[in-house]
């Protein structure tokens, strides 16, 4: 069983017997139509693209109500195209990892072309220019990570031959401008707040610089700034797509699926002919398009206005997912866990995040209307975090915690203040913040040192707790005033809102010798 065996819906019995869902559409017909009249180019050929946007389009094609595929362009790691796309006719196998330990297998054939987005690849770049000049093009989109939207001064000085992704995209937009100021929507699908603004700011920066350098007419800058021509909608995406998993590899090999090996590129991208991802997924997009769009709602995408996208983001980041992640990761590191899924089998930790979410954060949740916060958090606690296939580690999640506490917990505290709610309802959120002062010591609950995850403020914050020791008996905790008064870290001065002393008391308990972390966590979780 190989991906290249599948041509024009060749539904061999063996695939069906082994539980593989094959495309229900005419692959060659979709390829031909897309080549002539492309509607969508996606930048970023990584695993998240194949597991989510490409799979959503595959579902839309399977419905029989749409007939165009997506063309993928890679602007960073060109080996992905040569090794993970072209040898397999641009098809891939999506393996859906369920929290029950079961898997679902689906062949994704919605990608019709794969291109290297750089002028050094002459044919590929010429094809991209041709696509951008075609009036049929409706949308370009991105999963290139937040760093991919960066603009470097050196790149701005390279004129019309930039090397960074945003510069290349702006150069392609210039081709579209020259073809008649054709309309287009530029759509970020990366997991960062107000992602459309990041693309917009980058494109506008390049365009303005090129006008200043006399390389392009001022009308080009006006074109990318004209929202009747070019738009940059916001979106909220949520799906975990880990590296190819050895357990999944073995399951596929046992089926007789031969394309089951892992590919590691020179740039250290981990990819494969298959992609494994969690079952739960959300993609909500601001419906602000200038030239039409592919009907991705046929594959489950939610379209709404910008305010609703922002509310969904706040619901996730401030209440239903990110605070739970941070809470269990701070304590998970001190309790020597290395897997989030394993933490979910710990009664104290599981109850800890349940009560933070449902009892303390949910009274002030931002309800977006199109997604139910209770259903969202229920999926997080009951399906996503316990998923045995998800190799996510608390050590990864606590990276840069100093930059995350204000949004993940400070916003909830501020909402209690703004609404005049009783802050005595806040017990476990203060316990998270107390745990941070204990985590910064880098000593686990057995008294052994552990490696603290990278954080830009680590040295400064560790210096604050340096006088403290993990020991029984009296010690001076007055240094904590220098931590918990920091609104730049917590979003509020915790003393000014009446929580500072409560948190200090919890820190004292957490520092009271070996075993104090477990004892304190259990005490407050049970009492809550």
Where in the sequence are the language-model features?
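Substrate/ligand-engaging "lid" and interaction regions
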Residues: 1-43, 47-528
């Amino acid at each position: 069983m190989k991906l290249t065996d599948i041509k024009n819906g060749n539904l061999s019995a063996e695939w069906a017997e082994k539980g593989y869902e094959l495309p229900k559409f005419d692959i060659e017909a979709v390829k031909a139509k897309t080549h002539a009249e492309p509607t969508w180019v996606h930048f970023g050929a990584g695993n998240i693209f194949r597991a989510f946007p490409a799979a959503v389009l595959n579902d839309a094609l399977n419905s029989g109500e749409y007939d165009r595929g997506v063309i993928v362009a890679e602007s960073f790691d060109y080996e992905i195209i040569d090794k993970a796309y072209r040898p397999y006719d641009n098809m891939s196998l999506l393996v859906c990892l369920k929290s029950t330990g079961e898997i679902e297998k689906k062949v994704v054939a919605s990608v019709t072309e794969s291109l290297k987005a750089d002028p050094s690849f002459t044919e590929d770049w010429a094809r991209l220019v041709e696509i951008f000049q075609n009036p049929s093009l409706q949308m370009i989109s991105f999963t290139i990570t937040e760093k991919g939207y960066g603009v470097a001064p050196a790149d701005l000085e390279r004129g019309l031959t930039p090397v960074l992704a945003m510069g290349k995209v702006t150069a392609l937009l210039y081709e579209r401008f020259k073809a008649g100021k054709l309309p287009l929507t530029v759509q970020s699908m990366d997991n960062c707040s107000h992602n459309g603004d990041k693309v917009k700011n980058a494109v506008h920066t390049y365009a303005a610089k090129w006008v200043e350098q006399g390389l392009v007419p001022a009308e080009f800058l006006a074109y990318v700034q004209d929202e009747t021509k070019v738009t940059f909608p916001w979106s909220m995406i949520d799906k975990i797509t880990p590296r190819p998993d050895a357990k999944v590899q073995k399951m596929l090999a046992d089926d007789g699926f031969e394309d089951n090996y892992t590919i590691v590129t020179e740039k250290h991208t981990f990819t494969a002919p298959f992609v494994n991802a969690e079952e739960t997924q959300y993609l909500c997009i601001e419906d602000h398009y200038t030239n039409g769009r592919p009907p991705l709602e046929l594959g489950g995408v939610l379209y709404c206005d910008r305010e609703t996208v922002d509310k969904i983001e706040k619901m996730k980041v401030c209440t239903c997912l990110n605070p739970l992640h941070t809470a269990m990761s701070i304590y998970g590191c001190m309790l020597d866990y290395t897997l989030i899924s394993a933490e979910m089998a710990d009664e104290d930790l599981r109850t800890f995040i349940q009560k933070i979410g449902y009892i303390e954060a949910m009274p002030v949740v931002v309800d977006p209307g199109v997604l139910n916060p209770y259903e969202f958090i229920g999926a997080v606690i009951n399906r996503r975090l316990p998923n045995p296939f998800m190799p996510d580690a608390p050590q990864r999640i606590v990276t840069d915690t100093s930059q995350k506490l204000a949004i993940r917990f400070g916003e909830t505290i501020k909402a209690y203040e703004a609404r005049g709610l009783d802050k005595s309802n806040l017990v476990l959120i203060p316990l998270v913040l107390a745990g941070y002062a204990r985590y910064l010591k880098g000593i686990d609950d057995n008294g052994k040192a552990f490696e603290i995850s990278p954080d830009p403020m680590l040295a400064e914050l560790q210096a604050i707790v340096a006088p403290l020791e993990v020991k029984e008996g009296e010690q001076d905790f007055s240094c904590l005033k220098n931590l918990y008064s920091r609104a730049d870290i917590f979003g509020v001065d915790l003393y000014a809102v009446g929580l500072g002393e409560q948190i200090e008391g919890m820190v004292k308990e957490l520092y009271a010798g070996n075993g104090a972390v477990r004892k304190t966590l259990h005490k407050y979780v049970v009492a809550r």
